[in-house]
Every structure is written in structure tokens, then in C-alpha cells.
Amino acid sequence: MGAEPEIAIADNRDESRYEIRVDDELAGFTQYRPRPRDAIAFLHTEIDGRFEGQGLGSRLIAFALDDARSRGLGVLPFCPFVKGYIERHPDYLGLVPEAERERFGF
């Protein structure tokens, strides 16, 4: 048996995206745009096909949403994957500003 792969997630602010790496190889990212009034808009999430089915997308989004929460940022889930994650994990719904929830179907 091989060693467990090393998984690292970080905010790459130069690229405006959170990245997930497996053994130092980029496995996926979620692109965002900072918004005025203390919010972050998630635009697109992508996991490389070689890494699909391992739960990396969910780990990436959980990290990004937890980071937004710790920074006091509201979340605008334009990305369908992020929106779906919030639907499946309603404890994150509070990050979506009340005035924006109807827009996203919440």
C-alpha cells in the first residue's frame, strides 16, 4: 500500500481562486471575485478529471466557505457546484445575504 496523498487547500489571491492540490499537483479550483460590501462571488469550480470522485470538490468548497465565514464575508453562489453544496449543507446558508437568497433560489 502506498502512502496517503497529501492534500493542501489554499487561497491563491493572485489568481482569485481557492486551489486544492494533491501531492503538490493542482487538482482543482473554485474561481471567485471579491465584491463590494464584504462579499465574495463564487463563479466556477473545476476538478481535474483524474481527481474526480474523490470528494475533493466538496473539501475545496467547505474550506472556501469556512474561510469566507472566518473573514466575515457574505457569499454569492453563482457557481452551481457552490450553490448545490450550500443546499446540501444548510449550515452555510447564513453566509448568503438574506437580500440575495431569492436570487439564488434559497
Each model region followed by its residue ranges:
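Active-site rim helix/loop that mediates acceptor-substrate recognition in acyltransferases
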Residues: 1-16
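Conserved acetyl-CoA pyrophosphate-binding loop and the N-cap/start of the following alpha-helix
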Residues: 51, 55-60
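Conserved acetyl-CoA binding element of GNAT-fold acetyltransferases
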Residues: 39-49
